[in-house]
Amino acid sequence: MATGGFGCLLLLIREIDLSVKRQI
């Protein structure tokens, strides 16, 4: 359960990082 939550968090961070790079 902990690993699944971590993976979901990592995915969210990656999505935010991509959107930030698109803005720049």
UniProtKB/Swiss-Prot annotation:
> What switches on its expression?
Down-regulated 6 hours following staurosporine (STS) treatment and up-regulated 24 hours following STS treatment. Down-regulated 6 hours following beta-carotene treatment, returning to its basal level 24 hours following beta-carotene treatment.
Name the tissues where it is expressed: Expressed in testis.
Kindly state which keywords UniProt assigns to this record, in alphabetical order. Answer: Cytoplasm, Secreted
Instruction: Give each disulfide bond as a residue pair.
Output: none
- Coiled-coil stretches noted in the UniProt entry, renumbered to this chain: none
Provide GO CC annotations from the record: cytoplasm; extracellular region
Query: A single GO molecular function, which one?
Result: receptor antagonist activity
Q: What is its main location?
A: secreted
By its UniProt entry, which Pfam families does this protein fall under? Humanin
Q: Which domain of life is it from?
A: Eukaryota
Q: Where in the cell is it found?
A: Secreted; Cytoplasm
Q: What does it do?
A: Plays a role as a neuroprotective and antiapoptotic factor.
Protein family (similarity comment):
Belongs to the humanin family.
Annotated protein name in UniProt: Humanin-like 7
In its UniProt entry, the species of origin is given as Homo sapiens
Starting at the broadest rank, the lineage of the source organism is: Eukaryota, Metazoa, Chordata, Craniata, Vertebrata
- What gene is this protein a product of? MTRNR2L7
